[in-house]
Amino acid sequence: MRESFSIAGLVRPELEKLMPYEAKLYPEAIKLDANENPYPFPESLSSKIGELAAGDVLSRYPDGAALELRRDIAEYVGTEPEQVMVGNGSDELILNILLTFGTGGRVLITNPTFSMYKIHSQIAGARPIPVPRRGDFSIDVPALVCYARQPEAKVVFLCTPNNPTGNSTTLEEIEGVLQQVSCLVVVDQAYLEFGGEDALPLLKRYPNLIILRTFSKAFALAGLRVGYMLANTDVLRQIEKVRQPFNLNAFSQAAARTVLANRDVFKEQIQTVLEQREVVQRGLKSIKGVDSYPSATNYILFRTNHDSKVIFQGLLERGVLIRSLGGPELPGFLRVSIGTPEQNTKFLQALDQVMQQVGRD
């Protein structure tokens, strides 16, 4: 007699309430929801990437150590290649950190912040512990240190500039945590090219510091998923044990190297985004019923007195896609990425129309 199969008994208990991540597609809308570089990737650089990926590069496994890319990154940030690890986006690196150090322990997350810290903690079999930020979204250093000094605390995540709030944590605050804890402190600086203080100077003094960065935002490689981390060699040596072989494909490695060699092109785009950020801030402040928050990033957090889903849907009906936040931590809040001047104008016009409509309803 054939045994009956029940998948329920095989799934890890901590995954039962975890929902698959879904990124819905709205191809007809202006996409201002994911904090991407709004400008097309330069054609001149696309051809250079093609040259690097020619011949047998695509038919052979990539350099598993990504040595040339790590050398380029080290030169860009000002460290040694041995202190650099690359990954298939920062998500892979976050998960690998947690698989190495977090499983079975507590992971401290300064909510509201990047949602994937909690999700990857659950996947890795760690227990995510929220340590709420203050009313102005700054981190509560004393509370964080108190939690981090408990025996089961393994990893602290600090996102700066913080997603989705847009504010940055000072080096003094980061060091205030590092000085008082013995667990790992992961400082996610995905948006550093747009603002905030570089945490790299702290790396020499604190062996428990890990810094995360990415090519997805300022460098327009979100579609190729290239992230990297900077850490003490002893820390990276342990994470190497869980890293998948050949985890970053040859094409992505070639693209990242090309971007770094031509980063002046992206500096111009970054400057334009920063200028447009101020335009959008002024526009938001001019719309009745909208409160916006300061930003050190390529997006702006704002809130209204209405359900964020209603505002989101009203914008979508007018061809603009942004991020609806809501929930108990951010009621009525939304986040908009900075787009091109034309996209930003359409967003502001659409939001003004939506706010007038909900005000009449």
For each feature predicted by the language model, list its residue ranges:
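Phosphate-binding glycine-rich loop
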Residues: L67-R106
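Conserved PLP-binding catalytic core of the aspartate aminotransferase-like
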Residues: V273-L274, L284-R318
